[in-house]
From Swiss-Prot:
Family under the similarity heading: Belongs to the aspartokinase family.
Protein name (database record): Aspartate kinase FUB3
GO MF term list: aspartate kinase activity; ATP binding
Catalytic activity: L-aspartate + ATP = 4-phospho-L-aspartate + ADP
Sequence ranges assigned to domain ACT in this UniProt record: 404-472, 478-542
Keywords per UniProt: ATP-binding, Kinase, Nucleotide-binding, Phosphoprotein, Repeat, Transferase
GO-annotated biological processes: homoserine biosynthetic process; lysine biosynthetic process via diaminopimelate
Record carries keyword Nucleotide-binding: yes
Knockout or disruption consequences: Impairs the production of fusaric acid.
Metabolic or biological pathway: Mycotoxin biosynthesis
Organism: Fusarium oxysporum f. sp. lycopersici (strain 4287 / CBS 123668 / FGSC 9935 / NRRL 34936)
Listed EC numbers: 2.7.2.4
Use case: Fusaric acid is phytotoxic to plants such as cotton and banana. It has been shown to induce programmed cell death in plants. In addition to a mild toxicity to animals, fusaric acid exhibits acanthamoebicidal, antioomycete, and antimycobacterial activities.
InterPro entries assigned to the protein according to its UniProt record, in alphabetical order: AceGlu_kinase-like_sf, ACT-like_dom_sf, ACT_Aspartokinase, ACT_dom, Asp/Glu/Uridylate_kinase, Asp_kinase, Aspartate_kinase_CS, Dimeric_a/b-barrel
Higher taxonomy: Eukaryota, Fungi, Dikarya, Ascomycota, Pezizomycotina
Amino acid sequence: MATELKEYLVIIPDLPDVLAKRQVLLKPHNQDAAPLVKAGRVPFFGSTLAHHSPEGQQVAENGTVMIIKAESEEEIREIIRKDIFTIEGVWDFGKLSIWPFKIARMRNRRDNSWVVQKFGGTSIGKFPDKTSSDMLCTKFRKESLRNNEQITADCQELLDYTSAAKRFNLDINGKAKDKMVSFGEKLSCRLMVAMLRDRDIPAEYVDLSDIVPSNNLDQLKPEFFHEAAAVFGKRVEACNGRVPVITGFFGTVPGSLIDSGIGRGYSDLCAVLVAIGLHAERVQIWKEVDGIFTADPREVPDARCLPSITPSEAAELTFYGSEVIHHLALSLAIQAKPPVSIFVKNVQKPWGQGTVVVPSDGDDTSSWPIDYLDPSDSDSTSSTALPKMPTAVTIKRDITIFNILSNKQSMSHGFFVKVFTILAEHDISVDLISTSEVHVSMAINSSNMEPSQIKNVQCRLSEEGEVNVLPDMAILSLVGAELKNMTGIAGRMFAILGEQHVNIEMISQGASEINISCVIPDKDATRALNMLHDELFTKSAI
């Protein structure tokens, strides 16, 4: 008679400092475990940033987490030593922790263990087409009659809205843009609710487009986000066990959601606000790429997916051209109590490693979410310390440089005040700046500026001095938390560009010391990006 196998949760801590440093590459788990995985003896094999025992004590800062089916704890230890790990010294077997899985599962989760998943419009557009043959069945076709009426009504409302705007020649202001943008997300959410219900998953459509109480604020303030998070959380909790399918568009936002300081990527912010309101464990940002890369893989074929990144690094990459995570979403997620962990995953490869945004050594981790990664969060377990390296390199295009030489009719502080007052009058933000007492160079994102607007700004600035405008430029940025500890990295970066005859118009290094940027001609941007990545990432990693 066969002995019944029991499920055990097993945690094997890594040796000190293996994962503590930023420069880490996670490799696929040991192939020796594959037969056991296929046989069902190891149904889950993943990695952990930190883990608590069922009694509440922290037992692992970093390491490997598994679910193993075995007759006893003694058999588990033999399985681990003989069948899974062949390299001694990477894992600390003396601190092996084993619990019956049912107990660990019940006691090691938060009481309110929400996970917020965000899918972009492109993902939603591809997902139904890819899976329709499996998900659309007879029941869906019957229920689709009612769903079709709702979608038709939404479409008709949008058509009426745009028709009225054309008929009466109405100006399309920020609020009108918000209204029109919201329809696409409403339609997508209704479709996803129908598809989930077809799979016998109870789902509820949640419309956040008018949920935030209207106020008289003209500008976004922290109080607005606190209020929005609380309102979102209450609305989602009202679903009472049904899966909420939420519109990424939300309102009413002071000024406008699209034209305010939020703009593109607002659905990232919405997901984080929902997570904060629910005290969720994590936010998963699902994209069409494997995670956050060392460079844009569309321009740099050798770019690698980063297993982890710090919030400050992610914010720098977002600001300087990489479409990573909305900067406000990052800021709010890290400032929340407890902070919300963020995972970036590939919607087409949900089993992939992805990238996790984790606090750096200098961040307060006392209230950071503590849990092991589930199978959808990681398929990697081992790590190898690497030499100090930058984290990523990125390009931000559509940059225009304004060089202003003071006419010396005012003191330097008065000169700068007048320059920035002119920019503020035209709602222009400066991406990079370099100054002296009588000279200032500014790199400005001109992607949304009309040529006439640039000309008007130039004319106004010419009142304060001689103005030289350089269009068609790009900001090349090297980002990494370890840059401040890499002596000579700036010189090496500029030497590489100089050797390839790439002209540098401006140089800037942030006060945080995690970013070195320069402005170069846009025509050289792709070449410069590949050269830096090849020298500082590909060759340095060999």
